[in-house]
Curated annotation (Swiss-Prot):
This is Uridine kinase. It is an enzyme of class 2 (transferase). InterPro entries: P-loop_NTPase, PRK/URK, Uridine_kinase, Uridine_kinase-like. It is found in: Cytoplasm. The gene is udk. The keyword Transferase applies. One of its GO terms (cellular component) is cytoplasm. It comes from Pasteurella multocida (strain Pm70). Keywords: ATP-binding, Cytoplasm, Kinase, Nucleotide-binding, Transferase. Its EC number is 2.7.1.48. ATP binds at G16, A17, S18, A19, S20, G21, K22, S23.
Length: 216
């Protein structure tokens, strides 16, 4: 957790395994605090937007990218954007294409907010990134549950085959979770068990945000 007692904006980092429930928690907190803060004062940024640009590579090399390894992320740009937002400056967030396996020519314009929710699997693995965060959260969902959710999602939403999802899980998703993501749980201020429907944990996170904002 950041040591700043009066942050210019509050940055919440929600990490955990792929399909652990990070996006559900982020969207739930966002939706429920919109009514209190005004939707223009709270926003979500996905770590996925900061995968490195691979336009200089051919498709054969792009598809070999290990998206579960910290080296796949453009950490420098993400940290630069967080610093800019904290100083009151807007940023243009890259738009990443999973079809082309690289950034598109489009960007998402993002204005400074009172509360920014970051969500992504690798957020707590980088010390410099953790230093920019007000509250760090780890969603601690059993890995077998995450795999089932990921399998269903990737086959339904991304048109992938059962074999390709299982192969990716075996080769990169599970090993990278054990090597990088699970150890990063030690840096979390809040650990949320049972995934995105843990109502008590969500209420605790909202209460912490209110406290940092000076609201009761």
């Amino acid at each position: 957790m950041s040591n700043s007692s009066t942050p210019s904006c509050i940055i919440i980092a929600i990490a955990g395994a792929s399909a652990s429930g990070k996006s559900l928690i982020a969207s739930t907190v966002h939706r429920e605090l919109c009514d209190e803060l005004g939707c223009e004062e709270i926003g979500i940024i996905s770590e996925d937007s900061y995968y490195k640009d691979q336009s200089h590579l051919d498709m054969e090399d792009r598809i070999k990218t290990n998206y579960d390894h910290p080296n796949s992320m453009d950490r420098h740009l993400l940290i630069e954007h967080l610093k800019a937002l904290k100083s009151g400056q807007p940023v243009d967030i890259p738009v990443y294409s999973y079809v082309e396996h690289t950034r598109t020519n489009q960007v998402q314009h993002f204005e400074p907010k009172k509360v920014i929710i970051l969500e992504g699997i690798l957020l707590l693995t980088d010390e410099k990134l953790r230093d920019e965060v007000s509250v760090s959260v780890f969603v601690d969902t059993p890995l077998d549950i995450c795999f089932i959710r990921r399998l269903q999602r990737d086959m339904k939403e991304r048109g992938r085959s059962l074999e390709s999802v299982v192969e990716q899980y075996r080769k990169t998703v599970r090993p990278m979770f054990l090597q990088f993501i699970e150890p990063s749980k030690q840096y979390a201020d809040i650990v949320i068990p049972r995934g995105g429907k843990n109502r008590i944990a969500i209420n605790m996170l909202k209460a912490q945000i209110r406290q940092l904002l000076g609201k009761r």
